[in-house]
Amino acid sequence: MSILATEKEKEFMIVNMGPHHPSMHGVLRLIVTLDGEDVIDCEPILGYLHRGMEKIAENRTIIQYLPYVTRWDYLATMFTEAITVNGPEQLGNIRVPKRASYIRVIMLELSRIASHLLWLGPFMADIGAQTPFFYIFRERELVYDLFEAATGMRMMHNYFRIGGVAADLPYGWIDKCLDFCDYFLTGVAEYQKLITRNPIFLERVEGVGIIGGEEAINWGLSGPMLRASGIEWDLRKVDHYECYDEFDWEVQWQKEGDSLARYLVRIGEMTESVKIIQQALEGIPGGPYENLEIRCFDRESDPERNDFENRFISKKPSPTFELTKQELYARVEAPKGELGIFLIGDQSGFPWRWKIRPPGFINLQILPQLVKRMKLADIMTILGSIDIIMGEVDR
């Protein structure tokens, strides 16, 4: 009787995991309730990186706000820039030149590769494999060299503009990028050889954190989290934005819904991104890299613009882009899922409402359900397979 009584009276252990260091998964805190090694409950605590990004947007013009958006998901900044200019472009029915659209696709896919690489390294380190963590920086550095040559910045690029991009591709950049694509395919093959069939890796990820297709839809998951559960859904195919329809590529998806499936989806996406980049580089058309019509100046209404002091275009600020009085939801397929903004204009230069739909925030909601009845060591495997960046989770 005394043994049974002590079993009923035993208390669970509550452990704080985090707040983690910003260089890994971001400043996330998990309050984990344990029964020995078994996880009974897990409560994520968010908000350590909240900076009021939505409110800041409502007090800035689009051009002023562009440098801020690169701080949401700071590992895939091209996507946050893309969604920031896509919304106003759709509101104003602004046509983007074909060359600018091709440049955007190239930059977006390079950014997807860089994001997936910096997911792969820490994910493998979390589950005990240190070697790939050093390998991924080798390829990622080459991507950042390409970004720096084209945009002037390695990470916070501030490259997209309403109606196009800030600058054309420099001389020799296309050949350099094609060389990178050829080299990177051998790098992906090396990762697959090193990781995919490794028995220790499979022991840690196979059958861990399983999500069914219907369950993934009900939770609102997107990106690799959704595609790894057997749902073939990619906004590049669904929404036909930019010029993705002009390229031959396949949506990567798996049926199993576990951490291994999410790994395989992301590895496959890196290969498909290279295919898209190669086709875009080989077929990139000539012409302007931005829609110059929306930057025309009204000479008659402001004659002071044209006097001697202001005759150089560099001294003339871009006209304030006016957001028409309507509402719009725009979205792109970011590396972590569906990144969207709900935008309401009110006939002024500032948005009346700027609602951000971050994929990481919504994908993170399923974490407590996935880790229940799992072992303590599986928490980092499942959290790593979700792929979150707290900059966009907390905004």
Swiss-Prot record:
Give the primary localization class.
Answer: plastid
Q: Might you give the EC number(s) for this enzyme? A: 7.1.1.-
User: So what does this one do?
Assistant: NDH shuttles electrons from NAD(P)H:plastoquinone, via FMN and iron-sulfur (Fe-S) centers, to quinones in the photosynthetic chain and possibly in a chloroplast respiratory chain. The immediate electron acceptor for the enzyme in this species is believed to be plastoquinone. Couples the redox reaction to proton translocation, and thus conserves the redox energy in a proton gradient.
Membrane protein topology class: Peripheral membrane protein
Protein's name in the database? NAD(P)H-quinone oxidoreductase subunit H, chloroplastic
The entry's family comment says:
Belongs to the complex I 49 kDa subunit family.
* Matches recorded under InterPro entries: NADH_Q_OxRdtase_suD, NADH_UbQ_OxRdtase_49kDa_CS, NDH1_su_D/H, NiFe-Hase_large
Q: Quote the Pfam families the UniProt record gives.
A: Complex1_49kDa (PF00346)
Q: Which reaction does it catalyse?
A: a plastoquinone + NADH + (n+1) H(+)(in) = a plastoquinol + NAD(+) + n H(+)(out); a plastoquinone + NADPH + (n+1) H(+)(in) = a plastoquinol + NADP(+) + n H(+)(out)
NCBIfam families assigned to the protein according to its UniProt record, in alphabetical order: PRK06075.1, PRK07415.1
Ordered alphabetically, the record's keywords are: Chloroplast, Membrane, NAD, NADP, Plastid, Plastoquinone, Quinone, Thylakoid, Translocase, Transport
Q: Which organism is it from?
A: Citrus sinensis (Sweet orange)
Q: How does it assemble?
A: NDH is composed of at least 16 different subunits, 5 of which are encoded in the nucleus.
Q: State where the protein is found.
A: Plastid, Chloroplast thylakoid membrane
Keyword Transport among record annotations: yes
Q: Per UniProt, what is one GO molecular function of this protein?
A: oxidoreductase activity, acting on NAD(P)H, quinone or similar compound as acceptor
**Which Gene Ontology biological process is one annotated for this entry?**
photosynthesis, light reaction
What are the transmembrane regions?
A: none
Q: Does the keyword Thylakoid apply?
A: yes
